[in-house]
């Protein structure tokens, strides 16, 4: 699972500057970053300046082993791509991005098309949904354009806000994710399309405010979809896309924005401007860290989820914006950085929490060296408990048990083996927290000199 951050601070004019910002993300434990690229009407290709900036991002990410997700979006509701010409331009622009940046595999199409800030109109004059059918047409066109560049590209649709009013007469017309996905599915069926429109769903599962714990943010009786509403989301996807060429209940899910705002301590207050909206309800840093850990645990246990992206790594300066980062605006670390980094590490190692029904199978490698003394080097992709057995023919010559940390080589002494004899070494591996069947590794047979 990707555990990353939505953070445009890595968009820098030089590689050196981009690398400094990317290093900060790695310090927090993230293995992915989502950045945005704005499309404007009439554009069909990248400017030289934007291409240089994005190549710096991609190069810095490669140096740090970070995966890049690229959101292609219009800026605000005045540039919504509503006509066939605008959709063609948008799709050509996305394809140009993919051609210029072949290292980028993941593309998110649009941003929160279910709310009026990013997409208008939301409703037709008769009160029916105008946004979902128009977005479906854009997503289909972008999907085809990106796949024409490379079939390996993963197109993520939606990037949906978790809330919405579903009231065409509201002064702020919006759609709930439930209504928007329902209407998106209806538009897809009406198109008679025989190909998918997305390879995964992007969703922004924010809670009602920052004081709500992710594990408590369940909405069985409303149209909101937050982190703990996974079962509701999967059921909805199965309903709206079932029986079509578009995957529904098995569609991969990417939570590409989730944030909890933290209170700014007095010692850092002078770094910030503006006033915090009363509706935000920021929490102490320790609570922010605990909530981010809950978010990681929830996503880790949800079978279709492939990614969780926090919003942001670094605070925004304006208190009317987002102070949801793990670093203050001056790039110094918040007190909960270590807690969140540990949760991310444990998720990558498969031990962040126990999940009912989850059965992990460690994968790894086993190499034996005979000098200076016989020893095996075991490397597991996730944490593993191991039983290493040395055999000479059918006889067990040595056996050792232990636990290895995922991604870290474990050296295991093989006991006193006799010179001139041939041996075979095997390792039986199991996941310590969410065990499935054992994985058995076999090293190349060897002789002790």
Predicted region positions:
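Boundary/entry segment of secreted carbohydrate-active catalytic domains
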Residues: 1-36
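Aromatic-rich peripheral "rim/lid" segments of glycoside hydrolase catalytic domains that contact
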Residues: 16, 45, 113, 117-118, ...
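Substrate-binding cleft and catalytic face of glycoside hydrolase catalytic domains
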Residues: 24-170, 208, 316
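Noncatalytic carbohydrate-binding groove/subsite architecture in carbohydrate-active enzymes
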Residues: 71, 86-91, 129-278, 282
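Solvent-exposed serine/threonine-rich low-complexity stretches and specific carbohydrate-binding patches
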Residues: 396-407, 444
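Short strand-edge motifs at loop-to-beta-strand transitions and within beta-strands
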Residues: 408-412
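Surface-exposed, short loops/turns at beta-strand junctions within beta-sandwich domains
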Residues: 414-421
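Short beta-strand elements
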Residues: 436-449
